[in-house]
């Protein structure tokens, strides 16, 4: 088999392939075997009819068609591998010549990963917020903990912000009752904003047994986007009494004996959260600077596939009715044109990010260990509230294990850029990224330690 590659654009190639018929013998054997199982000829047991008689029955053209259809995928893959083509997406294959007994020729056009010129990562400089742990932040955490251990007590007064109420709701749109917006005995924390917009403002000042009408725009159901008249009736009013800030509370709410020990632990927790937040900000800003400075040609077919996927997700809950989507967007003050524009921009950014990080990973020989892959799977399973075994089965059935692997590899590629970049906070202090992300030296030492342990075993 011979193959040549034509570069059609920075992101697309045409592979020209020639396959001598002598190399198709196994494909012919497979085709004849399949036909022998399907066709019964007098005097021959099933599967034993000779090739020439089978060919006489179905015609040479049908045999050639079967052989070519079976041969194309494997010969295409072989050509891609031998040429070192980094193909992405599905190819467009066209058979250009069949000389029976002599030669099969076909072409395959496919999108490829573009060549990307990477910058010197040490030239990247970003500025992030400093890690600040204030007394107010500690008190906020302590208040949240006290609220968890608070008790609710019924009160005979008007509703105030922060109270807990039991309410009945009903709504109408143009005089029509909205069934999905009708409920009785709903528990609600006033000021949380967790139910209908405008509800908190309406019930503050009401007493148990009193009602009030207000208008609100419904966000779901048959009347999504419509303005409704909502009636709320307060059934009960309760206030939350908080435990005192003392050693007794510390012993109740934690493993510590004193309030000061509890506050010290809360300070450490806040510090960990602030470090995670700062690490996220560093990653985001480094990636943003990479995307702004590095030129990445985008494969049109890959971008289009992401745009199509966004549209599919949007209409999935609307019985795949695009007119229903257009109507919903209009009711939300948007339009199909804006939706398409946003989907296009999001797809272009997503594809550019993937190609760029893959290129960085290739240049840095970034690898992903089994432990790293397992850690990511366990993290995602916990995030979705699923058992790890169930989550693994789900991603395997959806052929998404490769996507998880690629995601981990891209994350490591970005971390390698962060390691080389210059990072300061807004006060001018240099941020030690190794403390937040680790370093390549740490990873090398860990790999060496793992190898040594394996040898000891």
Curated annotation (Swiss-Prot):
GO terms for biological process: 'de novo' cotranslational protein folding; cell division; chaperone-mediated protein folding; protein transport; protein unfolding. Residues 162-243 form the PPIase FKBP-type domain. The gene is tig. This is Trigger factor. It catalyses: [protein]-peptidylproline (omega=180) = [protein]-peptidylproline (omega=0). Transmembrane segments: none annotated. Belongs to the FKBP-type PPIase family. Tig subfamily. Involved in protein export. Acts as a chaperone by maintaining the newly synthesized protein in an open conformation. Functions as a peptidyl-prolyl cis-trans isomerase. One of its GO terms (cellular component) is cytoplasm. One of its GO terms (molecular function) is protein folding chaperone. It is found in: Cytoplasm. InterPro entries: PPIase_dom_sf, PPIase_FKBP_dom, Trig_fac, Trigger_fac_C, Trigger_fac_C_sf, Trigger_fac_ribosome-bd_bac, Trigger_fac_ribosome-bd_sf, Trigger_fact/SurA_dom_sf. The keyword Coiled coil does not apply. SUPFAM superfamilies: FKBP-like, Triger factor/SurA peptide-binding domain-like, Trigger factor ribosome-binding domain.
